Amino acid sequence: MPVTDLSELDTKKLYSYADYLLWRMKERIELIRGKVFKMSPAPGTEHQRISHELDRQLGNYFYRKPCQVFPAPFDVRLPGPAAKGDEGIFTVVQPDLCVVCDTVKLDEKGCKGAPDFVIEILSPGNSKKEMRDKYEVYEEAGVREYWLVNPSEKAVFIYLLSKEGRFIGLQPLTEDQVAKAHIFPGLEIALNELFNPVG
């Protein structure tokens, strides 16, 4: 019998992507190191507006370029170094937006391996543990650039992967500044327009 409700899962157990594929729940969930995290049932209006605007701007920038943009829901499987098959994958996340340049990582299920660029938009339902764990798994997997957008603070936090494989946090950007992607020259987002739409 497939699992249809989150209450049917043992919160002390570690689950794999093979388990995840058998679930038929209404709730959206992510696996982080085998632990189940329930996602917000439906993102709020501000979250969706920001997500749509970022998706539009990324789509314009990557038009006719080899990299591809994927908005949530889109499964990103982050296998560990020794992972073999779906049973060996214990992290499956759905970033708000991600950019994948290596098309070998793409299959009918989503992306297997680290996207080049990930954007997460904070929602009131995000726990500190969830955000800390995501930061760590993105770093370990080798995401080259990670943006954390905080709508309530009207700020963007940018993390770049160093040659040593560690994230380096840049100075936080506020609504009167421009966020510039470091791995994609020319990709710039005016935060005033992102956080304070006209019309």
Go through each PLM region and give its residues.
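Gly/Pro/Ser/Thr-rich low-complexity, intrinsically disordered segments predominantly at protein N-termini
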Residues: 1-199
